[in-house]
A protein has these predicted regions:
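Conserved "ABC signature" C-loop
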Residues: 1-20
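ABC ATPase nucleotide-binding domain "signature" region
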Residues: 33-38, 62
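Conserved signature/switch motifs of ABC ATPase nucleotide-binding domains
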Residues: 41
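Catalytic Walker B motif of ABC-type/P-loop ATPase nucleotide-binding domains
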Residues: 46-49
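Helix N-cap at the start of a conserved alpha-helix in ABC-type nucleotide-binding domains
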Residues: 57-59
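A short, surface-exposed alpha-helical micro-motif characterized by mixed small hydrophobic
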Residues: 88-90
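ABC ATPase "signature
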Residues: 106-107, 115
Length: 229
């Protein structure tokens, strides 16, 4: 009954078209009708297989909003099969990554996007965040091409409470290490802020070592991309 009421609310505009055979349905209308039909028997799980792959961005958002309504208002579990990582970020709570028919990694959206373990997952995440494209441009910058002996190029990843800390200011205050931000990105994933920076850190060798340790102690992932030999 709950699903029936939901269908009536969401699909009222489609009723007349269904009566006429639905010959003029758009891609988005077809997807909404397919969802309505799937709800007819009050299922506990709804499987959505690449349901937005052929839709324009506006219609994609509408379909995702409909699926979120189903999840939140009906308590319906939705298994969303997709290759579009932006959709995963927008709607999912948990993620399972498949390769050659095998499950290779699973976890919360926050876990997968902030700390992917498998190479395939890492490739997906790098593409979704735009870091690969950004790195091509960063590596061509003069400050990186001619990195000084007292500097290192690092990638920082942080999530949750660590995004609230004025970390780079603290590095200068305690270690006299300066930070030149070359790239930055922050997103909200499942209600949690997740950020990524590419930074040139400059200072004395011992100070740089101390700064790196302080960054890790603050719960921030650090990867040295260049320098520090």
């Amino acid at each position: 009954a709950q699903s029936k009421n939901f269908i009536e609310d969401k699909e009222a505009g489609l009723v007349s078209e269904v009566a006429q055979g639905g010959t003029n349905f758009s891609g988005g209308q077809r997807q909404r009708l397919a969802i309505a039909r799937a709800l007819a028997n009050d299922p506990k799980i709804l499987i959505s297989d690449e349901s937005t792959s052929a839709l324009d961005p506006k219609t994609t958002k509408q379909i995702l909003a409909l699926l979120q309504d189903l999840n939140q208002k009906l308590g319906l579990t939705i298994v969303l099969i997709t290759h579009e990582m932006q959709i995963v970020k927008d709607i999912a709570n948990r993620v399972a990554v498949m390769q050659d028919g095998r499950l290779i990694e699973e976890g919360s959206v926050l876990e997968i996007f902030s700390d992917p373990k498998q190479p395939l997952t890492q490739d997906f995440i790098s593409t979704a965040t735009g870091i690969d494209e950004a790195m091509v441009k960063i590596e061509k910058q003069e400050i990186v091409e001619h990195l000084s002996e007292n500097s290192i190029l690092v990638q920082l990843k942080y999530a949750g409470a660590s995004t609230d800390e004025p970390l780079l200011n603290e590095l200068y205050k305690h270690y006299q290490v300066t930070a030149n931000i070359l790239y930055g990105n922050i997103e909200i994933l499942d209600g949690t802020p997740v950020g990524e920076l590419v930074v040139v850190l400059s200072g004395e060798k011992a100070a740089l070592a101390g700064a790196q340790e302080a960054i890790r102690q603050a719960g921030v992932q650090l990867k040295v991309l260049k320098g520090g030999q």
